[in-house]
UniProtKB/Swiss-Prot annotation:
<dbReference type="GO" id="GO:0019814">
    <property type="term" value="C:immunoglobulin complex"/>
</dbReference>
<protein>
    <recommendedName>
        <fullName>Immunoglobulin heavy joining 1</fullName>
    </recommendedName>
</protein>
<comment type="function">
    <text>J region of the variable domain of immunoglobulin heavy chains that participates in the antigen recognition. Immunoglobulins, also known as antibodies, are membrane-bound or secreted glycoproteins produced by B lymphocytes. In the recognition phase of humoral immunity, the membrane-bound immunoglobulins serve as receptors which, upon binding of a specific antigen, trigger the clonal expansion and differentiation of B lymphocytes into immunoglobulins-secreting plasma cells.</text>
</comment>
<dbReference type="InterPro" id="IPR036179">
    <property type="entry name" value="Ig-like_dom_sf"/>
</dbReference>
<keyword id="KW-0391">Immunity</keyword>
<keyword id="KW-1280">Immunoglobulin</keyword>
<dbReference type="GO" id="GO:0005576">
    <property type="term" value="C:extracellular region"/>
</dbReference>
<dbReference type="GO" id="GO:0005886">
    <property type="term" value="C:plasma membrane"/>
</dbReference>
<comment type="subunit">
    <text>Immunoglobulins are composed of two identical heavy chains and two identical light chains; disulfide-linked.</text>
</comment>
<keyword id="KW-0472">Membrane</keyword>
<keyword id="KW-0964">Secreted</keyword>
<dbReference type="GO" id="GO:0002250">
    <property type="term" value="P:adaptive immune response"/>
</dbReference>
<keyword id="KW-1003">Cell membrane</keyword>
<keyword id="KW-1064">Adaptive immunity</keyword>
Length: 17
């Protein structure tokens, strides 16, 4: 399982696989 957190265009994107 991986956790990715990145800010872009004022939007928080979180991806968990």
């Amino acid at each position: 399982a991986e956790y990715f957190q990145h800010w872009g265009q004022g939007t928080l994107v979180t991806v968990s696989s």
